Design a protein with these regions (language model features):
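Acidic/polar active-site rim loop that often engages polyanionic ligands
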Residues: 6, 28-32, 79
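Short, well-structured active-site flanking segments
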Residues: 11-25, 30, 42-45, 94
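Active-site SXXK
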Residues: 1-15, 26, 156
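Short, flexible active-site-adjacent loop segments at beta-strand->alpha-helix junctions, enriched
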Residues: 1, 32, 151
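Alpha-helix C-capping/helix-to-loop hinge sites
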Residues: 29, 33, 86-89
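Penicillin-recognizing serine hydrolase domain
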Residues: 40-186
Length: 186
């Protein structure tokens, strides 16, 4: 979802240098405070609707609860199309900012969560990743997605949800197993 928020900013406010540092923090350290500010300032669910229409993301749906941007529904094809858009259609300066931020993802997100599961936990660099994690009354979610290989040759996406009560270590191990299974083809 944070990639959709970033792409919406690029489309609607392309000449906004102060947003560059904020977007960099939101994407690399998965900073929820920045995402919350941009979500509220730019129309919340309309961000998903606008960006999904512009990028032709067939499964993208805004969250049922307006303020829970992390509950936005995206299919794997939507995530792949989003990365392709960044690579092929985003303005060069913004593309570089987005890719540099994703490639600089620190081990721990701004909330202290260990982001090195899935792609960064299993695959060697180069990679540029956007990790996702959340708990809700319905499930525990852990996603890893990104670009890997020289020249960002491959898009890798693993979207995983687990029963309520699943601990993060168990979820991360399962996501790591999925990426490990994909690794020989990369």
């Amino acid at each position: 979802v944070k990639l959709l928020i970033a792409l919406d900013v690029v489309e609607r406010r392309p000449d906004s240098p102060p947003l560059r540092d904020a977007l960099r923090r939101m994407l690399s350290a998965s900073d929820d405070d920045v995402a919350n500010e941009l979500w509220d300032a730019d129309g919340g669910p309309e961000i998903v609707t606008r960006t999904a229409r512009r990028l032709a993301l067939p499964a993208a749906r805004p969250p049922e609860i307006v303020g829970r941007w992390g509950d936005t529904m995206l299919g794997i094809a939507d995530v792949v199309a989003t990365y392709r858009h960044v690579l092929e259609k985003a303005p060069a300066a913004w593309r570089d900012l987005i890719l540099d931020a994703l490639a600089a993802a620190p081990r721990h997100g701004s909330d202290g969560f260990d982001q090195y599961f899935g792609i960064p936990g299993v695959l060697p660099r180069p990679w540029a990743v956007k990790q996702g994690w959340s708990e809700s009354p319905r499930d525990v979610v852990l996603h890893t997605s990104g670009l890997v290989g020289d020249g960002w040759r491959f898009v890798v996406v693993v979207l995983a949800s687990f029963p309520v009560g699943t601990d993060w270590a168990t979820a991360a191990a399962a996501v790591n197993d999925e990426v490990t299974a994909l690794a020989p083809g990369l």
